[in-house]
Amino acid sequence: MRALLSVSDKEGIVEFGKELENLGFEILSTGGTFKLLKENGIKVIEVSDFTKSPELFEGRVKTLHPKIHGGILHKRSDENHIKQAKENEILGIDLVCVNLYPFKKTTIMSDDFDEIIENIDIGGPAMIRSAAKNYKDVMVLCDPLDYEKVIETLKKGQNDENFRLNLMIKAYEHTANYDAYIANYMNERFNGGFGASKFIVGQKVFDTKYGENPHQKGALYEFDAFFRANFKALKSEASFNNLTDINAALNLASSFDKAPAIAIVKHGNPCGFAIKENLVQSYIHALKCDSVSAYGGVVAINGTLDEALANKINEIYVEVIIAANVDEKALAVFEGKKRIKIFTQESPFLIRSFDKYDFKHIDGGFVYQNSDEVGEDELKNAKLMSQREASKEELKDLEIAMKIAAFTKSNNVVYVKNGAMVAIGMGMTSRIDAAKAAIAKAKEMGLDLQGCVLASEAFFPFRDSIDEASKVGVKAIVEPGGSIRDDEVVKAADEYGMALYFTGVRHFLH
């Protein structure tokens, strides 16, 4: 038996090599891997000695040789293949262990294009693909986490075709991921991220019980190990729908730096939000906006879930809590609640990945765009359109309302008062309907909107929403502007003594 080991990530390779040697494998290797194995007392043959061909062009050509690929690819059950191998002095290679040059790491650490190019692996992917193609005869490894499993399988004599097939699938996933990252990087560098092809690659974190509905299959995939690093289940497991709501709630609650923000989300839309002097007060005021919709919702906490906050949340049924951190006494509060799910990021405040791009599936393909964000200076740079200016407190509320609106399904309007959302209308086909629905819900909840502010994620096409806002005492409004009837909207604001700001930036969300 013969194994070829050539790895960039050398974690566990010495131990793996020793185990293979003990199992009777002859070991071939290259470069740094060869040196490391030899230094650790493993009998190893350098590939250039095996092929009788030197490494060429500063190591660019090492393993691209018929004796390597012939040794991997020839079928052991095909008499013609065996005959050709003997005629050409090609010896079988039964195990290939390769992981690739750290291209991604290099792009993160350096902008030197020559260095980046040199970290595109050629021989490694070729060997992995060859071994994967001939999986019926050859084992292929590209992940150090598989070393122990492979050794145990070999020791137990369970190296069957099904075992090798699973390694084969993983190998092709590995090379596809590698090539996709290279192609995306080149398009990002030279085509602004929008090249002729776009590759979206995720790593599976876990299967969900089902998808959006029980008859659908679902799973969570991640970019750059974000969930593995920042998502820990403390109580129960997240469903498919939980994950989408957690995403919406976390994105909103984490958008205010270190502020004690609480967001309550139901079916992807916020039904409560507040920033008060502490998290307990934030939760109390967030819940007031729509305590009916909050039932069975997701609560995101930009800080630590402690016992006091846990007791307050425990007064109603919420399905999910996602908190930056959770203390033990808080967990104890929910000990007898079987249905609640609790997750933490184990950090002082909530963490977002800030993905640069966003995509949505459409029938037959997907649309792809830069991710939307409310700029830090968006309100600061907004143009005052009215005669009246907003007060300092109103400006704080306008910023909160703006950010909530950006994370809410269009068409939407958001009313905020003293740091808390007091009304919201979302997902409506007309903006005036969103405005009216929000006011109706606020009245149902017994909330006083007098003195609140209003934000809209897109322009008001008519003055009717301003007229409605005046009836409940709105004092300041922020919107993008851009309607052919902007003059009518400005006139209405001045009639009612409102402050009106145009940001020039729309935040549709579909």
Curated annotation (Swiss-Prot):
Keywords: Hydrolase, Multifunctional enzyme, Purine biosynthesis, Transferase. It holds the Pfam family MGS. InterPro entries: AICAR_Tfase_dup_dom_sf, Cytidine_deaminase-like, MGS-like_dom, MGS-like_dom_sf, PurH-like. The keyword Transferase applies. Its EC number is 2.1.2.3, 3.5.4.10. One of its GO terms (biological process) is 'de novo' IMP biosynthetic process. GO terms for cellular component: cytosol. Pathway: Purine metabolism; IMP biosynthesis via de novo pathway; 5-formamido-1-(5-phospho-D-ribosyl)imidazole-4-carboxamide from 5-amino-1-(5-phospho-D-ribosyl)imidazole-4-carboxamide (10-formyl THF route): step 1/1; Purine metabolism; IMP biosynthesis via de novo pathway; IMP from 5-formamido-1-(5-phospho-D-ribosyl)imidazole-4-carboxamide: step 1/1. Residues 1-142 form the MGS-like domain. It comes from the Bacteria. It catalyses: (6R)-10-formyltetrahydrofolate + 5-amino-1-(5-phospho-beta-D-ribosyl)imidazole-4-carboxamide = 5-formamido-1-(5-phospho-D-ribosyl)imidazole-4-carboxamide + (6S)-5,6,7,8-tetrahydrofolate; IMP + H2O = 5-formamido-1-(5-phospho-D-ribosyl)imidazole-4-carboxamide. Belongs to the PurH family. The IMP cyclohydrolase activity resides in the N-terminal region. This is Bifunctional purine biosynthesis protein PurH. The gene is purH.
